[in-house]
Every structure is written in C-alpha cells, then in structure tokens.
Amino acid sequence: MGIFVCRNSLRMLNVRWLYHRCLSLYNSNHGFNEAKIKEKLAQFTGGSVDLSKMDNGIAEICINNPSRMNAFTGTMMIELEERISDLENWKNGKGLIVYGAENTFCSGSDLNAVKAISNPQEGMMMCMLMQNTLTRLQRLPLISVALIQGKALGGGAELCTACDFRLMTEGSEIRFVHKQMGLVPGWGGAARLIHLIGSRHALKLLSGALRVHPENALELGLADNILLGTEDGFLSEAENWIMPYIKGPSDVSRAVKKVIISGREQKLEDALRTEKEIFGTVWGGLANLQALAKGTKHK
Ligand SMILES: CCC(=O)SCCNC(=O)CCNC(=O)[C@H](O)C(C)(C)COP(=O)(O)OP(=O)(O)OC[C@H]1O[C@@H](n2cnc3c(N)ncnc32)[C@H](O)[C@@H]1OP(=O)(O)O
C-alpha cells in the first residue's frame, strides 16, 4: 500500500513537472539553470507576492513592496513563480486580478538586484525565469486583469502585458522606461506589447520611453477601461468588471480561455485541432445539458 501511494505521488509529481515544462519556454535544453538563478535571486530579499483565492472563483495577486514602489526583489520573483504554480493547480478558478500594494502597481525590478546582477549571463537567466513565469501567467485558464493604480514602470509595465486585460485608474501611467536605463524589455514585454498594439505604436512607446496615461492607453488598445472610483473601492470595481466574463461554471469559463490561448499561440491548423479537443471537454457536459433542458433563448 505504502509503495503504491509513493509510486502514485511520484507519478503525480512527474506529471506536474512535465506540465510545467510544457507551459514554460525555457528549460535545461536552453541553458537555463533555474536552481542556480533562484539561489542568486534569493540573496535579494524584501517584499512579498501575496495570493488570495476566493470562493467566487476570483484570485488576487498583490505585488507587495510599497517602500520600494512595489519593485520586484529577487525573492519576489521566486514567489511569483510559486504563486503561478499554485494557480495552475487551482481547478475551480475562473478569474485573476493582479494589483500593487498601497495604490501603485509596480516599479519594475529592484534596482539593488539589477546592480548586483550586472553580468549578461545572469541577466539573461533572470529574464528566462521571469519569461517562464509571465508566460505561464498568460497561459493560465483564468481570465486575468491587471489593476493599474499609480505607476507601472519597466518590468511593472511588462507584467501588466501578461494579463488578458488592463484596467487603469485616473492619474495612473504605464511606462516602458527601459531605454532610459540603457535596457530593453526582457521579461517578454516587447513581444506582448506588439501583439497588443502593433509594432509602430510599440516602437514609439519603447524608443521614447513614453508615459501612457489612461485615455491614451484606451485609444491604443492597451487599456480596456478607466476606473473612476476611489482608492478603497478599486479592487471591488475590478472584480465587478471581470464578473460578466467569468459568469457560469468554471469548466466552461476555463475552456473559453483555453480556445483563446490556442488561437493566439498556435498555427491555424494546430489551433483548430486544439479547439476541437477543448470543445470535446464541454460538449454534452453538465452546463451544456442544462442549457438544452432549459431551452435557453438568446433574445
Ligand atoms: C526589468 C527591468 C526594469 O524593470 S528597469 C526599470 C527599473 N525601475 C526604475 O528604474 C524605477 C526607478 N524609480 C523611480 O523612477 C521612482 O522611484 C518612481 C517609481 C517614479 C517613484 O518616484 P517617487 O514617487 O518620487 O518616489 P521615490 O523615488 O522617493 O521612491 C520611493 C522609494 O522607492 C524606491 N524605489 C522606487 N523604485 C525602485 C526600484 N525599482 N528598485 C528599488 N527601489 C525603488 C526609491 O529608491 C525610494 O526609496 P527610499 O525612500 O529612497 O529608500
């Protein structure tokens, strides 16, 4: 019995490991040494990445390092990866809101860590970790929203592009400040920005390190809405905003996000095949049968 349990747990661990390997971009075949870069990043402490999962199927991730305008320390990069793993295993989840503590989003990577990891090899290794994590965030079967209050700078601007939607509050800004730091985005923010607003607009934002205010972001298609409420109400406003998109049973909501991911990321023929597979998971399912039995009309 003990051996059986042990073997089963090992199989589960293997499946989980393989699953993460599939969702991630980089592994040891790409020269990525995850353990080594995590060991290095663990030296840069401070702040936290907090996850709460609610009964209504919405989770919240709080980037929490307000004394440094929610900059990502090394330990926070490691924690973000752990929180995404947790969400990958949350089978009832439907939505995710990513926000920053104390009414500002995130000021990018912690400059103390940036200074200490100044050689290109370690810099690229840190990028691989963050690209893996943010790609996994983007591929979660949850509808995700970045709630941007205050500033989303550098890596903070990159983080918000990994969410499906961006809600900005009045006076907030998204700014790819990398060029002013002698850098380019490395957490996948340039590639994702081009998908969102096209290469001409992306080039302007990156080469001019332009401040993108809410109205401008809305026009560009970078933001999806501007929230006009008060500081203590923005989280619940974001929750209300996401609600119509996650209404109904989680398996259907998750299937919707999955067909979007495959349509976005795969070649047409592969995407069509994946879509058929996902369709098979909901066809004849409980929600489908209930809708048929009710004679649902769409007036
Ligand atoms: C992936 C690559 C990247 O992310 S490169 C981009 C890195 N980020 C930056 O360069 C942002 C640098 N910070 C700033 O421009 C300003 O601090 C901003 C965010 C505009 C806030 O200005 P302000 O409202 O005047 O506040 P402040 O400068 O007094 O900051 C408060 C305390 O927070 C700190 N802080 C801020 N950002 C970071 C950061 N990224 N890394 C480490 N610390 C940061 C400031 O140093 C300041 O700390 P202290 O109160 O002086 O101890």
UniProtKB/Swiss-Prot annotation:
Gene3D superfamilies: 2-enoyl-CoA Hydratase, Chain A, domain 1 (3.90.226.10). GO terms for molecular function: carboxy-lyase activity; methyl/ethyl malonyl-CoA decarboxylase activity. This is Ethylmalonyl-CoA decarboxylase. Its main location: cytoplasm. It is found in: Cytoplasm, Cytosol. Belongs to the enoyl-CoA hydratase/isomerase family. Pfam families: ECH_1. InterPro entries: ClpP/crotonase-like_dom_sf, Enoyl-CoA_hyd/isom_CS, Enoyl-CoA_hydra/iso. Keywords: Cytoplasm, Lyase. One of its GO terms (cellular component) is cytosol. SUPFAM superfamilies: ClpP/crotonase. It is an enzyme of class 4 (lyase). Decarboxylates ethylmalonyl-CoA, a potentially toxic metabolite, to form butyryl-CoA, suggesting it might be involved in metabolite proofreading. Acts preferentially on (S)-ethylmalonyl-CoA but also has some activity on the (R)-isomer. Also has methylmalonyl-CoA decarboxylase activity at lower level. It catalyses: (2S)-ethylmalonyl-CoA + H(+) = butanoyl-CoA + CO2; (S)-methylmalonyl-CoA + H(+) = propanoyl-CoA + CO2; (2R)-ethylmalonyl-CoA + H(+) = butanoyl-CoA + CO2. PROSITE patterns: ENOYL_COA_HYDRATASE. The gene is echdc1.
